[in-house]
Amino acid sequence: MFVSDFRKEFYEVVQSQRVLLFVASDVDALCACKILQALFQCDHVQYTLVPVSGWQELETAFLEHKEQFHYFILINCGANVDLLDILQPDEDTIFFVCDTHRPVNVVNVYNDTQIKLLIKQDDDLEVPAYEDIFRDEEEDEEHSGNDSDGSEPSEKRTRLEEEIVEQTMRRRQRREWEARRRDILFDYEQYEYHGTSSAMVMFELAWMLSKDLNDMLWWAIVGLTDQWVQDKITQMKYVTDVGVLQRHVSRHNHRNEDEENTLSVDCTRISFEYDLRLVLYQHWSLHDSLCNTSYTAARFKLWSVHGQKRLQEFLADMGLPLKQVKQKFQAMDISLKENLREMIEESANKFGMKDMRVQTFSIHFGFKHKFLASDVVFATMSLMESPEKDGSGTDHFIQALDSLSRSNLDKLYHGLELAKKQLRATQQTIASCLCTNLVISQGPFLYCSLMEGTPDVMLFSRPASLSLLSKHLLKSFVCSTKNRRCKLLPLVMAAPLSMEHGTVTVVGIPPETDSSDRKNFFGRAFEKAAESTSSRMLHNHFDLSVIELKAEDRSKFLDALISLLS
């Protein structure tokens, strides 16, 4: 059931209990977790934190802890499946679910006792009505008894005939109801998409409790920015939510201009920015940022000689010396940096890039450290998905979580360096895929497979990294192809996962169009294709459009997917 009063029905309930937090491995979930941890610390709530990267880890962790806890909080996992069916909990177990995955499973919506959904109902949820999908068994058993009073045989016969007609009618009505139910559920469940950021939901709770701090507001901003960076929400949804957070930023960071000089070394200041759509440019060189931002790399077609030439023309149009552009942004001449945003935007317009600036936020820690929200997203994501062998997935999760605190800026800077490697590898892989024609049309969708032995292939074995690569590859392919039909197709991409087990990670990405509603139909399609071919598939990831597949089943799985979507 949906929780309408978060304070009374959620926070005041868990405040006096020991609770277990299951947190998914994505940046928005980490930010929501940080806000909740700060609230729990404030009120001395006892909790245990368990990171989970997929359904298997969630099931294992729940079995391990279910005897010690009655209250479980799930962040960015659990809403889009029948949770009680998967976890088989005791009847006194309560789950509070704060999750962006949509659609919300109907059993979770209509369970009043054990499932409590911490989800904003002003999101466009479109949940089917209870009577359209659930039917009481008593209805079907009614009138099934046959009264044997002392009536005349002719009366009994007439009544029996009436009952037979009535039962036939009821059976037909039930068949019609079941057919209608299947249609309703198919329409409701066929597309996967994302709702309001969980970090924003948790920040609103903190605000309701009058315990919202600037740090919490920053985490909410990073959570929303994570959704935008990963194309999980539409541009309109992003701009709307930026507007909501901007009001809180004004409230928390309201300063008179003459107060600027009195800022202390340890202050934290958040600002609304209309900044450049260039990744990590303030921590990199402008040239590296232009080459490794998917928006500019795709528009310039930087994988080609002609594209490189266009980039040089772009820099010449701005009048920026190559020496300045190729050195660290911090070392550029101050006179050039002053009007840099306007110069880049003006030249970008001439080169057909109308969206070079974007609404975002930045944070200052004291005088020295400044980060854009997207900088923090890329750094945190890279720490979490790090291919470094010096720690487990849990270690990487904790490192990523720690990097969100201002007391651990060294970890954040380390994350920025990892992010640069990941972004370079992404653009190099895209160039390789396009130059060797690895993106092929399979009819109803485009398909690309990274082979074992491809440079940096292990960087893309993790779901978030592969999803981001796929989205950037599709953007670049749409800019490079002259085939109009191919521009409108979705993309399926595969990358090696484990040589030992002979498995691949497969992701499905919806078509790249300006009007895209970011809804993804591949989750259900993958399920049906695997069922019809008995392919050995594991739906372990919380995003249904990401699966693990046995490499030897790949060709029959793809054939089934082609016939299903044709």
Swiss-Prot record:
Belongs to the CDC45 family. Changing residue 463 to L: In MGORS7; likely pathogenic. GO terms for cellular component: centrosome; ciliary basal body; CMG complex; DNA replication preinitiation complex; nucleoplasm; nucleus. The keyword Phosphoprotein applies. Required for initiation of chromosomal DNA replication. Core component of CDC45-MCM-GINS (CMG) helicase, the molecular machine that unwinds template DNA during replication, and around which the replisome is built. This is Cell division control protein 45 homolog. PANTHER family: CDC45-RELATED PROTEIN, CELL DIVISION CONTROL PROTEIN 45 HOMOLOG. The modification Phosphotyrosine is found at residue 130. Transmembrane segments: none annotated. The modification Phosphoserine is found at residues 144, 148. Residues 153-162 have a biased composition (Basic and acidic residues). Changing residue 226 to G: In MGORS7; decreased protein level. One of its GO terms (molecular function) is chromatin binding. Widely expressed, highest levels are found in adult testis and thymus and in fetal liver. Keywords: Cell cycle, Chromosome, Disease variant, DNA replication, Dwarfism, Nucleus, Phosphoprotein. The gene is CDC45. It is found in: Nucleus; Chromosome. Component of the CMG helicase complex, a hexameric ring of related MCM2-7 subunits stabilized by CDC45 and the tetrameric GINS complex. Associated with ORC2. Interacts with HELB. Residues 136-163 are annotated as: Disordered. GO terms for biological process: DNA replication checkpoint signaling; DNA replication initiation; double-strand break repair via break-induced replication; mitotic DNA replication preinitiation complex assembly. InterPro entries: CDC45. It is linked to Meier-Gorlin syndrome 7: A form of Meier-Gorlin syndrome, a syndrome characterized by bilateral microtia, aplasia/hypoplasia of the patellae, and severe intrauterine and postnatal growth retardation with short stature and poor weight gain. Additional clinical findings include anomalies of cranial sutures, microcephaly, apparently low-set and simple ears, microstomia, full lips, highly arched or cleft palate, micrognathia, genitourinary tract anomalies, and various skeletal anomalies.
